[in-house]
């Protein structure tokens, strides 16, 4: 397994729409494993393949405290959503920035697991929010897109400054 490079805004590759996975095979499973390795190394709770410049409909999530409840979503589809909630969200592609984003409180999805087996999942709370956040990435949408243009500009400037400082270090 290896840690992949996470794209940061304003990289336009984050805006690409991911294509469906045609076949879950050893290559896709390796991508899933590398994505988990990357997510854990970056201390995230979710990662979409788009964020690591792989434009296929793959998501990995682990919202557990012990980091031992891996969830793989290949070709996820949103079947139902209900209620309203929101928390301050962060994103590995928008480092050190957080903002309140409106989300559905509960979701029901259909996806394939790491072995290509179909399943359905009902989720609420943090898991539901994380699923929606990561599914947004698959269509080129970022949490900051829900914010006002002024807030988006401030976030872009802060991230660009942070990336410049890291490049000098």
UniProtKB/Swiss-Prot annotation:
Cofactor(s) needed, names only, are: Fe(2+); Zn(2+)
Keyword Protein biosynthesis part of the UniProt annotation: yes
Q: How is the cofactor bound?
A: Upon overproduction is isolated with 1 Fe(2+) ion per monomer, a Ni(2+)-bound form is as active while a Zn(2+)-bound form is inactive.
Is the keyword Lipoprotein assigned to this protein?
Answer: no
CDD domains found in the cross-reference section: Pep_deformylase
Q: Which residues form the active site?
A: 134
What reaction(s) does this enzyme catalyze? N-terminal N-formyl-L-methionyl-[peptide] + H2O = N-terminal L-methionyl-[peptide] + formate
PANTHER family for the chain: PEPTIDE DEFORMYLASE (PTHR10458:SF21)
Family per similarity comment? Belongs to the polypeptide deformylase family.
Q: How does it assemble?
A: Monomer.
Function noted in UniProt: Removes the formyl group from the N-terminal Met of newly synthesized proteins. Requires at least a dipeptide for an efficient rate of reaction. N-terminal L-methionine is a prerequisite for activity but the enzyme has broad specificity at other positions.
This protein's name: Peptide deformylase
């Amino acid at each position: 397994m290896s840690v992949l490079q996470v794209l940061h805004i304003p990289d336009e590759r984050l805006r690409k729409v991911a294509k469906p996975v045609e076949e879950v095979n050893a290559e896709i499973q390796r991508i899933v494993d590398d994505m988990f390795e990357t997510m854990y190394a970056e201390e995230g709770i979710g990662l979409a393949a788009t964020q690591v410049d792989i434009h296929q409909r793959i998501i990995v999530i682990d919202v557990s405290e012990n980091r031992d409840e891996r969830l793989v979503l290949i070709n996820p589809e949103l079947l139902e959503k209900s209620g309203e909630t929101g928390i301050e969200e962060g994103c590995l592609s928008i480092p050190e920035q957080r903002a309140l984003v409106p989300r559905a409180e509960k979701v029901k999805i259909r996806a394939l697991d790491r072995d290509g087996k179909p399943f359905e999942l009902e989720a609420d709370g943090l898991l539901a929010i994380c699923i929606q956040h990561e599914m947004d990435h698959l269509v080129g949408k970022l949490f900051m897109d829900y914010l006002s243009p002024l807030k988006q500009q401030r976030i872009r400037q802060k991230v660009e400054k942070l990336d410049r400082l890291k490049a000098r270090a």
